[in-house]
Amino acid sequence: MCIRDRGAKVHLTTTDPANHLNYNLAVQAGITVSRIDEAEVLEAYKNEVRSKAAETMTAEDMEYIEEDLRSPCTQEIAVFRAFAEIVDKAENEIVVIDTAPTGHTLLLLDATESYHKEVQRTHGDSPASVRKLLPRLRNQQETEVVIVTLPEATPVFEAERLQKDLQRAGINNKWWVVNACLSLTDTENSFLRAKAQNELTWIKKVEELSKGNAALIAWKNN
């Protein structure tokens, strides 16, 4: 919202099926919002493939196409292309993407690298948004990945794995955010105080991983 207040056009979107974004708040602030609905983009991609194939293929060939479209990787392709189209909007506005939890993000990252290599190898017919995706993500003047985690063992270890994969892919990450920190509250509950004390180990770990570039957000009762 601060970016929008400075006069920039902002597009907020999510790849997370859980979709925790507050759309009303964003719209009221003048921010464009969207989400990548896996079912919708899958059906749209299938229809695009069918339409293009029908121009040159026989009915028998179309049966093979339909069989191929039932492959699990078809959904990955559809989501990846939708992701690339969203990132391509950065030509005209600032795009903020809330990705799904770490495992889903890693799959998306792997798909991005794989597609980039395939496009380079085959020089095939692919959308411009796909061809430009990885170079844009690697451009530190255009892209910053902010890793968001919790002050707990598993989330921090998963986030560390994501950081390493980002580094391997040549994608910049400087800032981390640690959400729901009980250690920043004045709780008097003995159980929560013990939990808050345990958080300090993981907050310190994040500060090491981020080289001091970590923002801590206090736990709030929503």
Located regions from the model:
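A structural signal for isolated positions on well-ordered beta-strands in alpha/beta enzyme cores
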Residues: 11, 32, 96, 144-146, ...
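Conserved Switch II/interswitch segment of TRAFAC-class P-loop GTPases
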Residues: 116-130, 140-158
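C-terminal lobe/tail of nucleotide-utilizing enzymes
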Residues: 138-142, 150-222
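Generic beta-strand/beta-sheet core signal
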Residues: 13-15, 100, 148-149, 179
